[in-house]
Amino acid sequence: MDAHVFRRLAAELAQVLTGSRIERFYAPAPDITTIVLYAAGLKQNLLLRAGRRFPLLLLTPERPENPASPAAHAMWLRKHAGGRRLGAPLVDWVNRRMALPLSGSPVRWLVLCLREGVTVTDTLEDGFGSEPTWPDHARFASILEGREVWAAYPQYTPLLRETLAELAETDPWTRRRCLPILSMAPATALPMCISTAGKMFPRW
């Protein structure tokens, strides 16, 4: 999942997760965590599959089948976060993770990470959830030529670079609009970018 897609997904999930109560944790398979939530008068299942290839994060009415004996990590999560309510999340979208404060004192955080999975922590590192620095968008062409573009500006994900390169050939006007809007309003920019780069659409 591209970081910009995660950014938009996290904004939508925040509306459901904020104020919800954690009912239960399950681990139906390695690297997969199911969080049963009570939100908006309904029980819902938040499913996270962590890993480098094909990570997932979604709400679903269906709950995957679970092993007869709960996994150790699921039991640990139940101990430290079961029964707690979730506050408004901080989103580190560049690294595809979000942290939700748990009710109780002192405040602890439930962290959902597409690479590492689900955990609970007492503190977050400084700058968690801070927006990345965007360079002058007029310099985009020269930035793409640099070998260290990923290290300097991780928000220029491979898929975003490929999409903008495609737009440079097919729709330069839209490409010029995408970058400024992406840095401010992802929900507006993403549909605009992907709808005009047809062959890139399935990968978004």
Which positions does each model-derived feature cover?
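Extended, highly charged segments
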Residues: 1-204
